[in-house]
Amino acid sequence: MGRRSRGRRLPQQQQQQQRPGSAEDGAEGGGKRNETGWEGGYPEIVKENKLFEHYYQELKIVPEGEWEQFMEALREPLPATLRITGYKSHAKEILHCLKNKYFKELEDLEVDGQKVEVPQPLSWYPEELAWHTNLSRKILRKSPQLEKFHQFLVSETESGNISRQEAVSMIPPLLLNAQPHHKILDMCAAPGSKTTQLIEMLHADMTVPFPEGFVIANDVDNKRCYLLVHQAKRLSSPCIMVVNHDAACLPRLQMDVNGRKEVLFYDRILCDVPCSGDGTMRKNIDVWKKWTTLNSLQLHGLQLRIATRGAEQLVEGGRMVYSTCSLNPIEDEAVIASLLEKSEGALELADVSSELPGLKWMPGLTQWKVMTRDGQWFPAWDDVPQGRHTQIRPTMFPPKDPESLQAMHLERCLRILPHHQNTGGFFVAVLVKKSPMPWNRRPPKPQGEPADRRGPVQPSPEDPTAQSPPDPAVLGSKPDAVMSDAEAVERAEGLENDGSKRDGVCGPPPSKKMKLFGFKEDPFVFIPEDDPLFPPIQKFYALDPSFPKMNLLTRTTEGKKRQLYMVSKELRNVLLNNSERMKVINTGIKVWCRNNSGEEFDCAFRLAQEGIYTLYPFINSRIITVSIEDVKILLTQENPFFRKLSSETYNQAKDMAKGSVVLKYEPDPTKPDTLQCPIVLCGWRGKASIRTFVPKNERLHYLRMMGLEVLAEKKKKEGAVATNENAASPGAPGDEVGAEQEAEQPASLELPMAGDPASDPAEVPMGSDPAEVPTGSDPARDPAEVPTGMTWWRLAHPGEQAAGASPKARPASDLCAAC
């Protein structure tokens, strides 16, 4: 909505400027500009929809006596919500910084004569890691008093330490209760805010670089997949894979288990389906004028197919969360009831009422009706005329049998209403799989019938989208005996793929190869064990023998390998066994980057900051332990000489050969006022100096955690004159004023950009290619991170094209990350 509005604004403004008349005429005709925008031609959307009110009042989704509060809440702007992400130790430091610095500065602050409301924690989110505030984006950007807080939010969001996420969208991952060993599927993942929550749960223990579990994040929209990649990259996890498929027909994947291929079933599945979004009216005001019941009627079938496919891929005992940002029972309880009915007891709704203390919710509906967009009601399927059968389906109604309805326990679904805790509207249902789905049940063999002589048939790699239940006429009609889902899938695929004639009936035609749409991705090529590229790396960094070198991969089959990426062994298993079944957009983290003249330093590859936390536990050489004062110097100065660092650091660095190094800070528990989380940085040991290769936003993050505030670029430009004066007469060494100007206000110096060798030729070997220097996590600087033809701007603006001038990337904090 917002992008389309901006696209139409320019021609209208030009037309208004050409129109003659006074200021008063312009005000009436739409030519006068005020602080909120153009007055004419863009009337505010009236937040009323009689059909909406009639529909939900009739369904009684709101408790008696609360309707007015419900509607008033829908008309109010949605509070801004932020969630602290990342490893737990780092998250605690950010929380400490927020509470003791930024929030305290807001306590007595007034903007335009109004007292600023201090952010408050969400009562139901664990460990106070989620906060909400009524501060609007306009106030944050325009108020000088809030500039530091705004820059903090923007910078920390870019570096992935804070997520601007709608409060209710944080609920589904929490109810999944994912553990580090779980195999997790996110079926409709873009833009990725919930996916990042799941990744954080995998890495709950910071000391384990490779959790046993992984996340496969899928989205049907190819362009939105790249936004999903950008979100996931911030967390630098080797356990995330982004794929591009229709969620309703996700391919069956396989894994090698003890030399035998087995179907991959997931321990946790997040099924956050596309929906009409009428629970987002507070944020997406377009819904007020566009809402009809037709949207729900059209989406119901797709939602049910996606949920069914998810249930098929869930392991027995696993948990699946179905969620929408819609209040309509056609998209909510009707889908769950239909899924439970067709599962014949294989699925059941879990009681999660006690899992999020402090969350206010309403129980799911057990009775509802269907209404057409012209206001006609149908209480049951039998009342629907023949002419409406293509639009209205039997699965949209509650079950007829009262006992079956009661056994479903639809009241265990959670309905979140906006006026209860100042949120958006939301629906969540948690399903647990108790047994195989009914179409996966093995028919009993008649007595005396020999076993199947064909033997086990391996699934065909050319059948990526087969997801329909096997025909009972083929598998048998007596579902008394039950086999596991894996056995059922293997048997069904064996029958499907057997082309021989039986009883005069030909087998099905051979499956066609899966068609891939969107950008053609570079291949994922694992490095063979005998590759001569790895031994110099292993020797230079003294890698531990337990280092999983088989998990290293590149994105090229020809020429020099410029970057090395790493995945967990479980994702390696998935990649190797499903190359023809799925379209992988991205996986793995960058751990090494080639330096063309690196042979002079005994190793052609230098460390990449993106993967340093994954690599560090295996590195036994090239490690320099630094103090917190050293970290401040390394992050605020371009190439500090050894003599500027502490004597302990100098003694470690002076005898070390030139090349890539690890800079490690260990917190001192006896000094609680200092930074209490470990820091690992990658750097370069030059002839007489050390530099760090850390992205700018990550530098700012660490500096803030150490109590230093770096002012914004805008502030530096506005104070250019004062900056030059300060640079001309800096404080003398030991002078407290000079030290404060250097530490508290490093606006007078440019923070060193990650991987900018041009500013220090001595630090980069002669003949090296600047493009080879690691560039942090900015895809615009690393062509290998972005597919051919895909620019950084297109990551931030999926679906848009540049008009005229070169596009400018919009900060990720300005993007919608509510769902």
Name these PLM-found stretches.
Residues L74, I84-H182, M201, E348-Q376, R412-I416:
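Class I S-adenosyl-L-methionine
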Residues N222-K223, A247, K261-R309, Q313-G317, ...:
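Mobile active-site "lid"/loop adjacent to the S-adenosyl-L-methionine
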Residues H181-A190:
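Conserved class I S-adenosyl-L-methionine
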Residues H181, D205, P211-E212, L314-R319:
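Short glycine-dipeptide loop
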Residues G2-V116, E128-A130, T372-A407, N422-F427, ...:
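Polybasic, low-complexity RNA-engagement segments
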Residues P191-F210:
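Conserved SAM-binding loop of SAM-dependent methyltransferases across substrates and taxa
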Residues N218-F265:
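S-adenosyl-L-methionine
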